[in-house]
């Protein structure tokens, strides 16, 4: 069965479930304190749908993979599609394709999408390792550091470089974290970096490296606090500064 057939099956499944979906679906609330626009929220859902569909295709064609990965990522794609349709029903958007295209060339919108997806990477990575605290909450960095404080003091190097010796308890979440890191790299390199102000070149170069570091950390199963360090101390602050992202006023 080729890719087009797989996508056809998924789209059919989407249409059936979306038609019967409950209008009271709860939306994900992004834990970071950026003020998220409606367009950024829509684009984030679209990128999540695309990422989960990519995983369905990847594990469907892999001869040594189990059907469980295909099923789980298909379920995720359906859930995100339902959330997208629920959100569209509550908005005045007439053409989602136009919103998506425009968003890719709006630096503020796209920077918010990247920030959202980075939060989703943390959530999935935390779930993959059965971590009970919220990785997207910056204050939990203190808790994470204390949990491994003795190890870090004896090793003499940054927690960011330390490999996680634990085995993932949810491989599907780990797979999602991996593919989302690819999405973030692609969006930043192909679209967002070129939209930055000229005087922010040094910051953009550092941001590019930090996004690469995040991908490396995920692929090499670095401890969760290492990912938190990259995101909360580097990626999010640089996104905010370079693209003038606004914080939520509480």
Place the predicted regions along the sequence by residue.
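Bacterial N-terminal signal peptides that target proteins for export
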Residues: 1-8
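Bacterial N-terminal signal peptides
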Residues: 9-23
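Mature extracytoplasmic or organellar-lumen-exposed domains after removal of signal/transit peptides
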Residues: 22, 27-250
């Amino acid at each position: 069965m080729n890719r087009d057939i797989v996508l056809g099956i998924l789209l059919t499944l989407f249409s059936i479930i979306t038609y019967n979906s409950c209008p009271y679906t709860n939306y994900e609330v992004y834990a970071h304190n950026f003020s998220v626009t409606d367009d950024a929220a829509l684009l984030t859902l679209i990128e999540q749908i695309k990422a989960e569909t990519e995983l369905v295709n990847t594990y469907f064609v892999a001869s040594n993979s189990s059907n469980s990965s295909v099923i789980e990522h298909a379920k995720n794609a359906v859930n995100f599609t339902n959330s997208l349709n629920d959100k569209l029903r509550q908005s005045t958007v007439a053409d989602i394709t136009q919103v998506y295209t425009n968003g890719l060339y709006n630096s503020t919108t796209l920077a918010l999408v990247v920030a959202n997806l980075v939060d989703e990477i943390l959530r999935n990575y935390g779930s993959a390792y059965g971590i009970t605290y919220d990785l997207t909450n910056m204050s939990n960095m203190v808790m994470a550091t204390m949990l491994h404080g003795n190890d870090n003091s004896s090793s003499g190097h940054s927690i960011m470089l330390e490999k996680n010796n634990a085995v993932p308890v949810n491989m599907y979440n780990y797979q999602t974290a991996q593919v989302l890191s690819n999405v973030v790299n692609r969006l930043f390199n192909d679209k967002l970096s070129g939209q930055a102000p000229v005087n922010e070149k040094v910051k953009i170069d550092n941001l590019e490296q930090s996004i690469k570091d995040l991908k490396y950390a995920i692929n090499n199963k670095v401890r969760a606090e290492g990912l938190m360090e990259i995101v909360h101390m580097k990626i999010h602050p640089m996104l905010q500064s370079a693209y003038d992202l606004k914080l939520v006023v509480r």
